[in-house]
Amino acid sequence: MEPIVGSGKYTYRVNEEWQRPPAGLDVRACAVSVDSQDRVYCFNRNPEHPVVIFDRDGNFLSSWGAGLFTFPHAIRIVQENGQDVVWLCDEHHQTFQKFTTDGRLLQTIGEKGERSDTGVPADDFSSAAWKKVTHGGGPFNLPTDIAFAPDGSM
């Protein structure tokens, strides 16, 4: 029996057999988003296939991004000028990157590997590092998510 998650009118059945990647492709998705064509994008901690794309039925379509990410953390797909764009957040790179749906880099916000100065040692990636913050600093310091306002601003 498939487990049910959620509550109230937002309940879902978990289908652990939904995704059908090629044999040997390990999909350890840390974040998921869906484009306007109902394609499902999994931001994945597999360094050879960090962005894995499935159709709505779980059939593998493609992957891209090999070698571009260190610690994938968040994905959002938004419309810009009538086109889907893919925003990705890499926690350890300290960046937000915008791509076309087929993986062409359009924009990078932040400096790769440049953590803001908050008093935390730059090599401390522990989950308790936030306890060592002594002062505020500019963007970014271990970013973990992306949000957009109704007007489209990030």
Region locations from a protein language model:
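Eukaryotic scaffold repeat domains enriched in small/polar residues
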Residues: M1-M154
